[in-house]
Amino acid sequence: MVLTDEQRQAIAKKREEAIRRAAAYREREMQAAANATASTSSAAPPAPPKPVIPVMFSQNRQNFQPMKPTMNNSTKQSTINNYIKQVQKPEPTSLIKPTIGVKLKLDIGDRIKIEFYPFHSAVIDLIKQVPSRNYDPAKRSWTVASSDHITISNILKNATAVKVELEPLPQNIIGLTNFKPKAAPSDLNTVMDPSLIERLFPYQKEGVIFALERDGRILLADEMGLGKSVQALTIARYYKADWPLLIVCPASVKGAWKKQLNTFFPIIHRIFIVDKSSDPLPDVCTSNTVAIMSYEQMVLKHDILKKEKYRTIIFDESHMLKDGKARRTKVATDLSKVALHVILLSGTPALSRPSELFTQIRLIDHKLFTNFHEFAIRYCDGKQGRFCFEAKGCTNSEELAAIMFKRLMIRRLKADVLKDLPEKRREVVYVSGPTIDARMDDLQKARADYEKVNSMERKHESLLEFYSLTGIVKAAAVCEHILENYFYPDAPPRKVLIFAHHQIVLDTIQVEVNKRKLGSIRIDGKTPSHRRTALCDSFQTDDNIRVAVLSITAAGVGITLTAASVVVFAEIHFNPGYLVQAEDRAHRVGQKDSVFVQYLIAKKTADDVMWNMVQQKLDVLGQVSLSSDTFRTADKMHLRFNDAAQPGIAEYLKKTPDTTIDEWEDPVEEKEDDDLEIICDSPAPKRIKN
């Protein structure tokens, strides 16, 4: 059918009308939405929209009209109700609760630290509801007693003024807040040999009691030189019913531990030192039996040790067990699970590297942290790295320290126990290392050359060559000892005087000090006299200068370096007067600290000969009072050394004729500690009184 022009015009008009009505419909919809939005600010809800009447087209395009909707009363009411539900009055902005993140942490002193962010006074008001709350203005932090853990948690959870997102303490830490030490005797003299106990300093007695309160499972982390080894032996002796005792230590200090036992426990006559795989272990379990071995031998004898079930074990230098994947750590862990008493010794606990503490903690209490992954996330900034899980950081360090001090660790710095220490302590340290071993043939040849020479002049020349070679060979081991024991990461700030004789030894020490980027001064024979005063002043006043590298002969007199409290002799000298004068650069008027003196000795070197020569030049032993880190007074000290050919350090440091009694007031001597070995074979003289 062909449309006429009139029909086409009519269709076009109707189409335009339909478009117009559709546009009008859309405009009404938009207006209704605008009215609904505007009405949200008024108290009354907006009027419901009128029902939409759809436009229906009939098949005949020439005639179209809207269809009337069919809607009864119930349908209308339902539509209105649905619309009212959709258009709700929003809560005013002023009534929205701020969200505050709150984190609970264990703090030192049986306290729980409360950290929150952002700051809101409402949280302060909540904390103040707890009677035990305390504010530390220095740390700007709030704490409550650990016994109020549940109380503060409930108060924060039920807060109304703010929305609290609470991060509570982990369950294992909550359990630790309830930890109660075991009852221990307040007077050790009632349960142990009084002659042993009276030799301990007060802080050492506290360390023993701390261990007994924890059933002999602790980490003894006192600073080097404070007598960890004698504390460990005293603790172990309390549990003699659970002997034989097993001591695992670095190979170089096995002899030192034996001497400690001979000194303090002469009744113990069955001491087994395991040097090689064929060496036997104790075949009977008695309270007078001790086995001493290196970590390497512990690994080799793992099966035998596990079968014997040692119930009291000392792990010396326990930071050697920091690697959980190392075989020695796995063996030590197996042994510690069977043992009743486990005593760890370390003067350098890695509190800023908590990942290294995990294995040591588990040796003492394997239930405290059962999972390294969880431990690392909370304390090591543990996270998934590009290739593996990484735990190299440090988080919540204060909480970890609080846990360790409460449950398993005791650590005292020299500054903490200064009142208990004598004015000056001396000790001999035997150093060893691959550089010494590698040159042992040369050293033995030099010694043989010295011994076979008859001419006094030639003998002196030969000794000087032997002395020089010894200094060169010792230098690397000396540097390693000084840096590892005094300038390790997190070491307490201290100043150290390092004395040597040969230029090559001084140079080696200077290079290693510079590598560590330690501020230092150097005074030797090449230092102009007018420069010495300025160098000494800078050492005394500049906190960034921590090391003085000094010549025994050139810097041993005429200068004051009392800012240092540690004196290390990398080499010794023929004349004991030079040694005493060098010590007194730090031990003199103006010194407010206890001076700690170390002599670094290498066995089978010229040092052996030098000690004998020093002894021959001394006249009397009298005016030197001795005091070890295990004895409170010199009068009670009687150290013996099995090798009669090896003279004691007490004999080397006798008073020289031109030394006044006042200058020698209270000089003291200290026996071996940890990897240190004292060699004394004479009873202590009486202390000189003014």
UniProtKB/Swiss-Prot annotation:
Motif (DESH box): 316-319
SMART domains: DEXDc, HELICc
Major site of localization recorded for this protein: nucleus
UniProt enzyme class: hydrolase
The organism's place on the tree of life at top rank: Eukaryota
Domain Helicase ATP-binding: 209-367
Catalytic reaction annotation: ATP + H2O = ADP + phosphate + H(+)
Domain Helicase C-terminal: 482-639
GO terms of biological process kind: chromatin organization; DNA repair; regulation of transcription by RNA polymerase II; replication fork processing
Protein family according to the UniProt entry: Belongs to the SNF2/RAD54 helicase family. SMARCAL1 subfamily.
Role according to the record: ATP-dependent annealing helicase that catalyzes the rewinding of the stably unwound DNA.
UniProt protein name: SWI/SNF-related matrix-associated actin-dependent regulator of chromatin subfamily A-like protein 1 homolog
